[in-house]
Structures are given as structure tokens and as C-alpha cells.
Amino acid sequence: MKKRVFAMLMACVMALSLMACGSKSDSGDAGNNGGDSGVETIKLGGVGPLTGGYANYGLSVQHGAQLAVDEINAAGGVSGKQLELSFQDSQGDPESAVAAYGKLMDWGMNVFLGGVLSGETASVVTAAKADDVFIMETTGSADKCIDGNDKAFRVCFYDSYQGTAAADYLNDNQLATEVGVFYQSDNDYSAGLYNAFVAECAKTGVTIKET
């Protein structure tokens, strides 16, 4: 998990570097992107379940992101600027994620790392667009969780990609012609993978016997 989050945050850092370089030739308002030459710290914000049923997942992402921030800062930061991370608890609830996002904006967030869960990101993506905040989504994998925001980008696989890849692997390696599937229908991530898996199995001839 730490390696995955580190790689994701490094992608964010590269994007920030480009933004910082671009701001040098921009005499206008730098907005909330952390590119203002007067800003010594780039504030990164994240939202996720630090308590509740999904806390183990949220805490892993938070700790991995903080580790990456510490290592990047120790190496000199981004274009001479230090990174600062604030991670707010959503308890895994989309409505609580909106309140958590609001706290990050009050704090002065420059870049939003998205929600740990897809539903969290989907609940704030419109507000982030209105606030002109750059989003680098690191773990929310639902296909449409960042739709409608042209400043939102993603560095993780889509659910449909993962579900399709799983079905293709099953078929390509002739592992089974009939399968049963356990999934959580009220969980966006689980349901997204399931739907893509079932759709691809229908194309490859693998029969879903039980779900």
C-alpha cells in the first residue's frame, strides 16, 4: 500500500511541478494551485474513513501519503516548496466527506488528493470545480467518480478495467467455464468490479452460476 500511494503522490508532485513552472510566466492570479511564487508551502488535502468500518483502508492511505510527503520534503520538496498534508475523516460517508472537504478549504488547501472511496470523491467533485481546486484522485476507482470536472485527474485503475481484466485472465488461462461470485452490492467499488466482470464473462463465454 505504501509503495502504491507513494507512486500516486509522485504523479501528483510531477503535476505540481508543471503547475509551478507554468506560473512563472503567468502574471495573473495563480488561483489555488500552489503555483504562486509567494507560497512557501503547497497544501495537499485528502478525505477518507479514519474511523468506522473502512478505517483500516483509510488509515493505510493516510499513512502512506504522509510517508511520501515526508520523503519528498526531505529531498527538497517541489520546486523549492515544501508539502503539507491534511487528511480529514469522512467515516466512509459521502455526506461527511462534503463536510471534511469544507474543512480542507477553510485550511487553505491547494490540491485535493480526492477521497479514499469513490463515493466520497463523487460527492465533492462539483464543489471542487466551483472552488477551482486541482484534483489528483489516487484511489477512487468508480468509472464516473470524477466526471464533470475538467481539473480532476486520476492515477489509479477504473473499476471497469479491473473487472474486465479479471474476466479476461480467467478466460485466457482456461481456469473455469462456470464461476460463482461473492460481492457487496451496496459498495460502489465491489459492485463496479462485479458489473464489469459479468459483462466481460458474457463476451468470453464464462457462465456466472451464483452471485
Sequence positions of predicted segments:
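Flexible, small-residue-rich helix->loop connector segments that border functional cores
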Residues: Q66-V78, L170
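Extracytoplasmic "Venus flytrap"
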Residues: G38, I42-Q66, Q88-P94, L117, ...
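An alpha-beta-alpha
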Residues: A152-T211
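Structural recognition of the beta-strand scaffold that forms the well-ordered cores
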Residues: K43-V47, E84-F87, N110-G115, V133-T139, ...
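Short acidic, glycine/proline-rich loop/turn micro-motifs
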Residues: D147-K151
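Short, low-complexity disordered leader/linker segments with a strong preference
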Residues: M1-K43, A74, D106
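Alpha-helical elements of the RecA-like P-loop NTPase motor core of helicases
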Residues: A55, E95, A122, T164, ...
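Beta-alpha junction/loop-to-helix N-cap segments that form part of ligand/metal-binding clefts
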Residues: G28-N32, D36, N56-H63, A75-I146
